[in-house]
């Protein structure tokens, strides 16, 4: 009897394993899945029944419960569910409007790794994938006010770099992969208080300068009016500095970047800033030349700096009295102490310095 038992148990195990294997193979009798493609996919070593729970009955019903990726990807699922794409993060969207795992990553049986260019979520294809919902002609979800972000991104230096196979920011680099949040959420990567750190992940040297500047320190201390990267460079349509249409091009800086804040009466009164900085520049020989389209003429950044802007009282400031000769000397070779003869931002009817007044009159 013991001998029979010893022989019977292995036989039963063999039969059970064979039946299971047949069940797995039998899926292909009804479901057209390329076994070669699936075997090469990231999920190639997973059995059908690992995902399709309840399909073990050979006569299983049609319309099985949807596959739950969270069974294996629990941490990612927790991030996604509270994101703007999750049911808790976007209460006003129906479940049908919410992006699914396969909606972004592709059909699971032929899915490829995110590092592969063929993956829908590879950096080079994120614009296309995200554009299914956020592209031109698509109605923006309730509460989303950004117009055509994908079209704007496609024209940017970031998209050009990605297209050339270089390292460039794609959608997920700024908005995160599985947990994008509204820009109004303090935990969002693109919230005003986090923009510097988000851009700093790639632009480390520039960020280190900005964080020490008057603008960076103010932003870090919660001053929402203080500009961060996107306020000057834009959000999705970030262009090269010298490109036509770039807000930070030489001719646009005074008008489109510095001017809107430093000519704003509310901001100047709130923070005790001088009211005449912008109009006095516009009426100067530098300002008139810039308005005339001259590229090689001093603008705000030429004198005050770009990212490392400091008060004139700071010894490291480009416009500190002891540094003016060097600052002006970048354009005016041989500039010496005479370049400190008077204030720069002066209006014709207010300047108390007769020498500066006549220099201004002669040049204009």
Feature-to-residue mapping (PLM):
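Positively charged n-region of N-terminal signal peptides that target proteins for export
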Residues: 1-5
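Bacterial N-terminal signal peptides
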Residues: 6-15
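Short sequence/structural segments immediately N-terminal
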Residues: 18-364
């Amino acid at each position: 009897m013991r001998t029979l038992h010893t022989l019977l148990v292995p036989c039963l195990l063999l039969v059970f394993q064979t039946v299971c294997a047949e069940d797995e193979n039998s899926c292909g009798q009804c479901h057209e899945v390329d076994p070669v493609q699936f075997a090469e996919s990231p999920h190639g070593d997973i059995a059908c029944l690992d995902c399709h729970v309840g399909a073990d009955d050979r006569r299983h019903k049609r319309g099985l419960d949807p596959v739950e990726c969270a069974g294996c990807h629990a941490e990612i699922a927790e991030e996604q569910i509270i994101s703007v794409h999750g049911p808790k993060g976007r209460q006003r969207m129906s479940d049908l409007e919410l992006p699914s795992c396969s909606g972004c990553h592709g059909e699971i049986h032929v899915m490829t790794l995110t590092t592969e260019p063929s993956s829908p979520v590879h950096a080079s294809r994120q614009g296309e994938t995200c554009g299914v919902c956020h592209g031109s002609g698509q109605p923006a979800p309730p509460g989303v006010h950004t117009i055509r972000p994908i079209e704007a991104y496609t024209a940017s230096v970031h998209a050009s770099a990605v297209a050339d196979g270089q390292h460039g920011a794609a959608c997920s680099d700024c908005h995160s992969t599985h947990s994008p949040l509204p820009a109004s959420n303090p935990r969002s990567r693109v919230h005003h208080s986090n923009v510097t750190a988000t851009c700093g992940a790639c632009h480390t040297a520039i960020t280190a300068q900005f964080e020490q500047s008057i603008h960076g320190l103010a932003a870090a201390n919660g001053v929402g009016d203080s500009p961060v990267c996107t306020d000057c460079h834009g959000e999705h349509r970030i262009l090269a500095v010298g490109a036509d249409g770039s807000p930070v091009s030489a001719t646009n800086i005074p008008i489109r970047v510095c001017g809107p804040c430093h000519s704003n009466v509310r901001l100047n009164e709130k923070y005790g800033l001088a009211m005449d900085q912008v109009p006095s520049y516009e009426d100067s020989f530098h300002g008139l030349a810039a308005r005339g389209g001259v590229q090689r003429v001093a603008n705000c950044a030429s004198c005050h700096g770009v990212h490392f802007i400091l008060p004139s009282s700071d010894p490291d400031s480009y416009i500190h009295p002891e540094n003016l000769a060097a600052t002006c000397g970048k354009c005016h070779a041989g500039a010496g102490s005479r370049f400190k003869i008077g204030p720069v931002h002066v209006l014709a009817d207010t300047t108390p310095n007769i020498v500066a007044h006549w220099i201004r009159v002669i040049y204009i």
